[in-house]
Amino acid sequence: MAFSSCCWILLALTWCTSAYGPDQRAQKKGDIILGGLFPIHFGVAAKDQNLESRPESVECIRYNFRGFRWLQAMIFAIEEINSSPALLPNMTLGYRIFDTCNTVSKALEATLSFVAQNKIDSLNLDEFCNCSEHIPSTIAVVGATGSGISTAVANLLGLFYIPQVSYASSSRLLSNKNQFKSFLRTIPNDEHQATAMADIIEYFRWNWVGTIAADDDYGRPGIEKFREEAEERDICIDFSELISQYSDEEEIQQVVEVIQNSTAKVIVVFSSGPDLEPLIKEIVRRNITGKIWLASEAWASSSLIAMPEYFHVVGGTIGFALKAGQIPGFREFLQKVHPSKSVHNGFAKEFWEETFNCHLQEGAKGPLTTDTFLRGHEEGGGRISNSSTAFRPLCTGDENISSVETPYMDYTHLRISYNVYLAVYSIAHALQDIYTCIPGRGLFTNGSCADIKKVEAWQVLKHLRHLNFTSNMGEQVTFDEYGDLAGNYSIINWHLSPEDGSIVFKEVGYYNVYAKKGERLFINEEKILWSGFSREVPFSNCSRDCLAGTRKGIIEGEPTCCFECVECPDGEYSDETDASACDKCPDDFWSNENHTSCIAKEIEFLSWTEPFGIALTLFAVLGIFLTAFVLGVFIKFRNTPIVKATNRELSYLLLFSLLCCFSSSLFFIGEPQDWTCRLRQPAFGISFVLCISCILVKTNRVLLVFEAKIPTSFHRKWWGLNLQFLLVFLCTFMQIVICAIWLYTAPPSSYRNHELEDEIIFITCHEGSLMALGFLIGYTCLLAAICFFFAFKSRKLPENFNEAKFITFSMLIFFIVWISFIPAYASTYGKFVSAVEVIAILAASFGLLACIFFNKVYIILFKPSRNTIEEVRCSTAAHAFKVAARATLRRSNVSRQRSSSLGGSTGSTPSSSISSKSNSEDPFPQPERQKKQQPLALTQHVPQPQAPSTPQPQPQLQQQPRCKQKVIFGSGTVTFSLSFDEPQKSATAHRNSTHQNSLEAQKNNDALTRHQALLPLQCGEADAELTAQETGLQGSVGGDHHPEMEDPEEMSPALVMSNSRSFVISGGGSTVTENMLHS
């Protein structure tokens, strides 16, 4: 009796611990009991517990048809397993299912019932008492729904290692096996769902959203994960609010105010339906429309929110739903529900009343029978429903479940129901593994197996962790190390049904968590219906899109998603909208006008085909042609006096160097290459130095010839042709050394300059060393300066040697060109640098060619009469007379000044005719003064040998060459006449040479002694002040020569005058002339 009493006491405690009556549970006996937790109601009624009496369990309100369907799915799966011969044969599964009322407190009440029963069962009281009402232990629990509820349940069940398989709790916190040791689930965790939400926002190019989350273990972790994903994608969150079904009205209104004032059109919601319902109701009351709701799977298909009267607010919602499954026979099972037939389901009675809005007779504590049901109907009566305060009519019992549209019968997309079905089968397959376990291959110590008849919860948990089976849909079911079951999501869009006006969930895409990143999301935009029945994707950005060619610019104090569009700078581009930065174009490209792409830069250099390049090329070719023409003329007329007088060999070399100068300019035209860059400056420098070296040697040689007396063998030896070429080579060799050092140490190279202009690449030559270029040009200018000095010094030599004057002009042109070149070279860039240097080379080359050779070519071709030996001698004699006359004029002025100081008087010299004969006694006879001033004539006759006294016939002499030169001195003009006796050239030269030597002996220190042998009228007393500069002997060889003369030394004034047969000087009316003659 004692044990019997104890048994009844424990059973009573167990019964009381549950705090549930028969109508608040679904229960069926079996060999193995499975527990179930389902939200048959959405919440509990608020009650003030003032503790004036014994507290009672709160009442559940607002019936949940979908929760009842989920419960039906568990019962259907258990009955299907019990009827299956292949799965757990000879064993029966029972169940104990409780209503959580979507609250933690109710769920914990049910969980305590499971735990207490297991503890009582562990005492093995059956051995001591006959307990017919003994209930086996609950070896596993299916549930709960919300993550917050499952968290509380898991903490309690985990203490006793009772496996919990949830069908709808997706919080990622539940994957923590250190805290939730016995928790498993047949739904993916929210980590994938949050990532999928961020992918959708990125897909539609939204970046300005708001977030709302339930203030529980489902909403907070889910929205936190979403924030992390949004930050990685540069998605900004305008507001973030927490809600709860227990929030007061003021809190709800504050959240609604935030939503109403926000510019974000997209709102991401991590919440369950019950928690979100109060907020949606307030939004509907305020008629806030135009928002796009992005729903998590917990409310994406919630019947609380998906109501037709809310559609103008929530229409167009994009939500995530679990992959729909198929449960064969489940539809028929749902249709068979009836209070009289569902004897083990205490929730069927309330379901029937809520479905048909009627009430059933309150009966006994147990399930209603048909008689009781009918008797209650006959007796009538009424009661207040726990979900309504209105009186309802009695139910007839003949109502047709198919005639009423409720969420219970919405079996088209079985998602949560299928997860419940899968959870039950997972536990069944774990029990099957225990049932079929072979000793030695088990999961326990030493491969042992559990006893299926005495199986414990922890043993089932062990087999669940190693579960692997194939579902009825052919999918492999296995839990990972975190107890999660991987799965995919369907993307649904809320539409309004045209048939009955209800909200339907149309599948518009899917999210595959197993695919590669970037390939997981698929959306069919054509199927989406947005808020307001629009097909256009709504705009939910803080700023308008920045078009291609612009970038996003940060606004101070604003989130990164709020920006201004800034045009890309030149040289950068963006080819996409909302570019965060502009990409820099490659070096050889530049941005187009709109900065949307890069186009190839224009390549610019001094091209052969452009007008400027063509013009320079034509001028260079013209210079080459003219130089070649001059060279041809000089070769053809190489034996004429004018060619010989210019030193034929040096002239040929000079013309060759000018050819090189003109040719070197062509290296500056065309696209610069490394080899052209290394060749053009040395070619130009060496060519010009060779040219100027030739001019320098020629000018210096002529100057020395004209300053010398009658040329000696010394002059001929040291100023021979070999020495001239040696000097030219030495001068040129210095330039070659400079170029060689330059090319070895810092060789020039082609260079693509991107910095001068943005849209143009200038291909130029990088000189390598500006110092080397300075040395090259500086050395050239140094030689040119020396050449200019000698040319200027010999500018007054005889007219036929007047190339010194033209060389002076050419050197002036050379200096002007290159002095102008320096600032022009420094101030230009790109192709104009080469153009400036080409112009300088051509200008200098044309100056040298024109000044030195054009006059000679003109005489050779068009004035052949001047290209004779007589012309050369005539101009040379005139030059000698000029020198003597200047000396005489200077001395006459000095004598006049002396006479004036002594009181003497001077009169005009009368005109006279003087004849001078050469003899040894009186080489300079004094002329007789005449009384009357007449034109004067000075005649020199060469002494003739004595002839016999008897007259003899004289042979007719050949007419001798004769020339006249007018010389102007002050106010007077002197006409100089000169004739030559060619047959007596040698004798005359010998005689005059002897006479010259006698004069030199007397006037060795006089500056005019070089001309005294030629001018018998010249005074023997020299002016000590006369210098070489005063004689005007600064110039180059420019006169005509006798064909037999090979050297300019033969054209010196002394030799020319000594070769003359006679000369006559006449003039009149000039004191200067008279003084010159009488002196």
UniProtKB/Swiss-Prot annotation:
Compositionally biased intervals (Low complexity): 892-918
Region Arginine-rich retention motif: start-end pairs: 890-898
Disulfide bonds: C60-C101, C236-C561, C358-C395, C437-C449, C542-C562, C546-C565, C568-C582, C585-C598
Record region (Intracellular loop 2 (ICL2)): 699-722
UniProt-annotated stretches for the region Disordered: 892-963
Modified residues (Phosphoserine): S892, S899, S920, S1062
Residues with Phosphothreonine modification: T888
Places the protein is found: Cell membrane
Extracellular side: 20-610, 669-674, 746-769, 829-832
Taxonomic superkingdom: Eukaryota
Chain positions recorded as spermine binding sites: D238, S240
A Gene Ontology term for the protein's cellular component: plasma membrane
Gene Ontology annotations of biological process type: detection of calcium ion; G protein-coupled receptor signaling pathway; intracellular calcium ion homeostasis; regulation of calcium ion transport
UniProt GO MF annotations: amino acid binding; calcium ion binding; G protein-coupled receptor activity; protein homodimerization activity
Protein name: Extracellular calcium-sensing receptor
Organism placement in taxonomy: Eukaryota, Metazoa, Chordata, Craniata, Vertebrata
